[in-house]
Amino acid sequence: MRATTATIDLGALRHNLNLVRQRAPGSRVLAVVKADAYGHGLLRVAPGLAEADGFGVLRLEEALALREAGYRQRLLLLEGIFSMDELGAAAQHGISVVVHNAQQLAMFEAMAAASVKPISVFLKMNSGMNRLGFKSQAYKQALQRLEACPVVADVSLMTHFATADEERGIADQLKEFDAVTAGWHHPVSLANSAAILRFPEAHRDWVRPGIILYGASPVSGVSAASFGLRPAMRFTSEVIAVQTLEAGDILGYGARFTATQATRVAIVACGYADGYPRHAPNGTPIAIDGHRTQTLGRVSMDMLFADISQLPDADVGSQVELWGEVVPVDAVAEAAGTVGYELLCAVAPRVVFKVTG
């Protein structure tokens, strides 16, 4: 069997969840598991996050899968509902819903009170990111309309920060949110991963960790390890062939690499069809038998190349870490000009997944 494997470490997930609790000891934790748990597999990771106070998902189907698997804590649809049928299903299964636009609000008002169990709602403010949510001048009226709906059990308040991971920080958005909601007595959820780590003033009643649960960094240029995080995914394969190049020999499609001296090259069973970034350049970090080295040439559909000139023991069958413990996913992402989030979410269905811990 082809060796390309993603191993999910439940112990690392538990560790990272505990770190969130240490950072925000007064807050409940809504573990964000959208996008199939950032590519790790929703029902694979759920046991490692079972002590979370709730789960944030994108699609109703994800919430129903968690309910069917026996998870009884709060489930929150982060984009809300898109039809009256979805609203009814959310009510039936005790799923909380974000409301971020007038159309969703109107659906709540149109739902007959006797037909569903009351639903917990998170009302989203657009405090400056300009993606989802009611602008500040419309926010109070939206709250009043929701609270007048018989199908609404309770309302929490939320917003999302655009630059919690950057030098600009959250001050402007936090000021906007606090000014509008001053004197209100509702549970509040503000902090994403970066804000959990950097801005304790935003922790409030609920925090919403995402990428940090999976052991990657939300802050460019700052390692996950420096925050005490552990990688939840180890993406591995093996060497399936070795070639020795002479000076002047080219390597792979497009001749992206030309040897300037004798070079030993490992051919690794992993390519862009497995989720490795095709645009990763020469020099992207990779580990062979636990030793860090670098890629060479262009990534192809099923294979990539690694320099083993300084690893005389490396040969066919040697173990390869694409990212994980020796090579953080953020290091590969930085070399490829992207973010760890994208790489984790892009691991392909043909990769074998295993669970440990």
UniProtKB/Swiss-Prot annotation:
Its cofactor is pyridoxal 5'-phosphate. It comes from the Bacteria. InterPro entries: Ala_racemase (IPR000821), Ala_racemase/Decarboxylase_C (IPR009006), Ala_racemase_C (IPR011079), Ala_racemase_N (IPR001608), Ala_racemase_pyridoxalP-BS (IPR020622), PLP-binding_barrel (IPR029066). Keywords: Isomerase, Pyridoxal phosphate. Its EC number is 5.1.1.1. One of its GO terms (biological process) is D-alanine biosynthetic process. The modification N6-(pyridoxal phosphate)lysine is found at K34. GO terms for cellular component: cytosol. Transmembrane segments: none annotated. SUPFAM superfamilies: Alanine racemase C-terminal domain-like, PLP-binding barrel. PROSITE patterns: ALANINE_RACEMASE. It catalyses: L-alanine = D-alanine. Substrate binds at R131, M301. Pathway: Amino-acid biosynthesis; D-alanine biosynthesis; D-alanine from L-alanine: step 1/1. GO terms for molecular function: alanine racemase activity; pyridoxal phosphate binding. It is an enzyme of class 5 (isomerase). The active site is at K34, Y253. Belongs to the alanine racemase family. NCBIfam families: alr. Catalyzes the interconversion of L-alanine and D-alanine. May also act on other amino acids. HAMAP family: Ala_racemase. This is Alanine racemase. It comes from Methylobacillus flagellatus (strain ATCC 51484 / DSM 6875 / VKM B-1610 / KT).
